[in-house]
Structures are given as C-alpha cells and as structure tokens.
Amino acid sequence: YKKAAGNIIMTAADDIKFNTKKWDYLVQEEFNFYPDKILLVFGYDGLQPPGSIATHYFQSREAIEKVGYVMPKDFGYNYSDNWMTTMYRAIGRLSYIPIYVEHIHWGAGKAPYDEIYKEGSDAPHEESIKLYQDKERRDKDIEILKQGIDENLCFYDRYYEEEFPL
C-alpha cells in the first residue's frame, strides 16, 4: 500500500472479476459517507453468503496507518479476511455495498486447480486458525480503530439483499 497513490486500498485475491459497472464510484461514495474514513467496504463474491465475510475488501489509508497493516502479515493464505471482518464488525464499520466482485475460485468449479491454488490450499491452516483465535491481539487492534472513529456517526445498512446485483 505504501507505493499506491490513492487513499483507498483494495485487498483481493488474484482470481476475481468485477461484474458491477461503476463499482469504483460506489466504493468511493461509501467512504465519502464517513468523514473519519475508518471502515471496511466489501461486496458479494459469488461464494460466501451475501454480507457475511469480506473476502475482497477496501479500506482507507487512514485506517491502515492506525493499525499498522493492510492485513496481518503472519496469516499466510488463510483467515486474514475473517480477522478483518471481525474487527470492523466489532466497531460497527463493516460496510456491505451492492457490488459483485466475483471470486473465480477452483472450489466453486470456476477455475482449474493449478499449482498456485495447490500452494494456497495445501498451506497449513492450523497456524492461521490459531492466529485468528488470538482475541487479545485482535481486541487491541479493535481499540486502536475505535480511537479513530467519530462516534456521532452510526453505521446502518443502506442496502438490502434483494437490491443486490447477483
């Protein structure tokens, strides 16, 4: 993110496709709604239940600099999306918007199971699970994010599943 010029940073897999026109406008508008810019914005990925987990997400440079990371580096291939979803849900700043960023994953029959997938799928999950379960560490980061938010703003879901472009 340090080499990026923009203030909104996306974390995503390399097997995605943007299926919503003007998705970038919708993301920017969501960030504009929150002057403190502390939120995690995501859309439907075609695999997870809508609104459940931010598998591919956007966050602000301000939020990244507060916690000191785009995502925890020690997670490897798995569970950092769970970590980020849990953190932003805890502060009421997990924002699900009507964009479809399709995850073209082998597990859904959308791509061949190649060497790259094999490397990620065969990676040890136990360490990532253990890291994800480190509530004390996550709570510390949640508190850091809370210090940066304007408590007069409350999150509300402006989008409903039936409006979502699936």
Where are these regions (language model features)?
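Conserved nucleotide-sugar donor-binding
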Residues: A5-G6, T55-G68
